[in-house]
Amino acid sequence: MTDTAENQTPNDRQAGHPRSIRSFVLRQSHMTAAQQRAIDTLWDSFGIDYQATPVDLDANFGSNRPKILEIGFGMGTATAEIALRLPETDFLAIDVHGPGVGNLLKLINENHLENIRVMRHDAVEVVENMLQDGSLDGIHIFFPDPWHKKRHHKRRLIQAPFIAKLLPKLKTGGYIHLATDWEEYAQQMLEVLSSFDSLQNTATDYAPTPDYRPETKFEARGKRLGHGVWDLVFKRIR
């Protein structure tokens, strides 16, 4: 299923690069007038269209500040808050859902944020084709879809092959920060990250929530359901 044409960013209609298994499902979602207006008026300033060739992030941001990749930002509320808390850091935020893209662009405008750029595309393809090796200082993946049913676990984003694609993009000394409210997925995340010799856990197992990460709607929902929340922060050591 794909989003309707009026919910698309200018680059959405291009031919994709098919993969056999995706970690997301595109759902028909309602785009508010304000979200669509934000896309129409702000995309040229804060959006980055997908291309199958490497991109110069410093040129796109107009700065050489540290660069953080955020994969899956939902409605963008936490992303905007983190960018406010870390004004000397640039954030490349990627998601596939139109209303969230529009909402984050609206928040960028409302909060006068200059340190966020937005992409609406499959993050795996962006990592594979657009990001240069050693271009990232950090990677945030907060509350990715846990795909609860066992037969769907193959759709989970955090698996060794994807981490292997991410690692070359991360500078030595850079970090990967994951968070989930699904305990079994947290265990899988811990096992996957621990399997890489080039990554070192900053905690014994799960890390305290860093000060920069605000509570997301997914976290609040999980707490209401009685779930715990697990943060993992691993540093690239070589």
UniProtKB/Swiss-Prot annotation:
Ranges in coiled-coil conformation: none
Enzyme class: transferase
Name the record gives this protein: tRNA (guanine-N(7)-)-methyltransferase
EC number of the protein: 2.1.1.33
Protein source organism: Neisseria meningitidis serogroup C (strain 053442)
Originating gene: trmB
Catalytic activity, reaction form: guanosine(46) in tRNA + S-adenosyl-L-methionine = N(7)-methylguanosine(46) in tRNA + S-adenosyl-L-homocysteine
Keyword S-adenosyl-L-methionine in annotation: yes
Residue positions binding substrate: K149, D181, T216, K217, F218, E219
Binding positions (S-adenosyl-L-methionine): E70, D95, D122, D145
Function in brief: Catalyzes the formation of N(7)-methylguanine at position 46 (m7G46) in tRNA.
PANTHER family assigned: 3-DEOXY-D-MANNO-OCTULOSONIC-ACID TRANSFERASE/TRNA GUANINE-N 7 - -METHYLTRANSFERASE, PENTACOTRIPEPTIDE-REPEAT REGION OF PRORP DOMAIN-CONTAINING PROTEIN
Region of interest (Disordered), ranges: 1-20
